[in-house]
């Protein structure tokens, strides 16, 4: 009998952390890691471009914070033209409750800008600002793939 109770506690306890309602505003700190596949055009040493799709997951710091255990998928495009690097990425994230966020990332002049586009459930009408720090680089495990992580911090305000 004790084994069954212990097993139930193990299964049920992660959900108790998410039963509490999120504060209407606060700060966030999380790390996201991903893996993806890309299609590359190598026109020359100074002119390249690629499109990609990636999937990944996020962990908040400390665990249990906003955006903890979110999963995401992204599509995007990168270009390096005469040394000028640009990138554009759109990501759909889903949290443990099934609520979603749509986020747009753009890269130019060595800086990543993140824009919250839309949300469902608790994220509907959310406003967020923050910074994105790329971690890595990481070696590709297989040709045509890429892996990476970033660290995101900032503030949010829910509707």
Identify the residue ranges that each predicted region occupies.
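Sec/Tat signal peptide C-region and signal peptidase I cleavage site
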Residues: 15-19
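Beta-strand-enriched cores of mature, soluble protein domains
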Residues: 20-159
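Sec-dependent N-terminal signal peptides
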Residues: 4-13
